[in-house]
Design a protein with these regions (language model features):
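Short, Lys/Arg-rich, polar N-terminal cytosolic tail immediately upstream
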Residues: 1-12
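Small-residue-rich hydrophobic segments that form or flank transmembrane alpha-helices
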Residues: 12-61, 136-173
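Hydrophobic/small/kink-forming positions within alpha-helical transmembrane segments
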Residues: 70, 74-78, 182-190
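Helix-to-loop junctions at the C-terminal end of transmembrane segments
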Residues: 78-91, 196
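A membrane-interface helix-boundary motif in multi-pass transporters
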Residues: 91-97, 190-209
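Cytoplasmic-side transmembrane-helix entry/capping segments in multi-pass membrane proteins
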Residues: 92-101, 122-124, 145-149
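Symmetry-related core transmembrane helices of the 12-TM Major Facilitator Superfamily/SLC fold
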Residues: 98-105, 202-218
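C-terminal ends and interior cores of transmembrane alpha-helices
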Residues: 104-118
Length: 229
């Protein structure tokens, strides 16, 4: 089996769709950290630690910087779930595509925000990350996260341990899928960190491009299904 093998079933769960979504997730995190005041868009654990640290130091201004993305992340999950509940029966466009489209529009706007609005930019990116992680939770039938690594690392290592005890090739394939997701996220973060040196705030538009590819891939799969019917 190849890493980007042909997928049967929902294209939103395919590795091909996830490939670009995961790269985008890594890029977004590097973007807010490198270009928007060292705030994490995805890793809310880090933001909560820093929020708590500044609160106990009595530094309310710095605490607010980390509170805003945390609240935006929660709101993003809520909105994504509302979209799912209201549009899950749509036929022409999949509800997950609506999420991606909203992400593209919001991230495109972030690229125009000046440094003086970094708090706003970070809030929007965190909101987008939450919208992304909520609907895209499976790849090749396995639960995963496209915007953070700790769960994928745990699942991959657990599967690898199971493989060494059972020698089940399917379990090995599962482990490699998880570690592949982590590597893709790291690649996206690396691309984002380098790109910010050259393009600054506009780097986030690369993420828009990656998400656009995923958006179109889901259309292509729908057309293939219609031709096969």
């Amino acid at each position: 089996m190849t890493f980007l093998q042909k997928h049967h079933g929902q294209m939103s769960d395919s590795m091909l769709t996830a490939f670009f979504i995961i790269l985008s997730g890594g890029l977004q995190d590097a973007y807010t950290y490198c270009c928007r005041g060292k705030v994490f868009a995805n890793a809310q654990t880090g933001n909560i630690v820093l929020l708590s640290t500044h609160l106990f130091e009595g530094d309310w201004g710095q605490a607010l910087r980390y509170l805003v993305p945390v609240l935006a992340f929660l709101l993003g999950i809520y909105i994504a779930e509302c979209v799912h509940r209201h549009f899950k029966r749509m036929e022409k466009v999949h509800w997950r595509q609506l999420i991606i489209l909203a992400e593209i529009v919001l991230l495109a706007a972030v690229g125009f925000l000046p440094e003086t609005l970094n708090t706003t930019a970070n809030a929007v990116v965190s909101f987008v990350c939450a919208m992304q992680v909520q609907p895209f939770r499976k790849v090749r039938g396995h639960a995963y996260a496209s915007t953070m690594c700790i769960g994928n690392m745990r699942s991959g290592t657990e599967a690898l341990c199971a493989y060494f005890h059972t020698r089940d090739k399917e379990i090995l394939h599962q482990a490699l899928t998880y570690f592949g997701v982590v590597l893709l996220f790291a690649l996206g973060a690396g691309i984002g960190s380098i790109a910010t040196l050259h393009w600054g705030a506009g780097t986030i538009w690369l993420s828009c491009g990656l998400l656009t590819v995923s958006f179109l891939i889901m259309f292509i799969h729908d057309e293939e299904q219609k031709l096969n019917e």
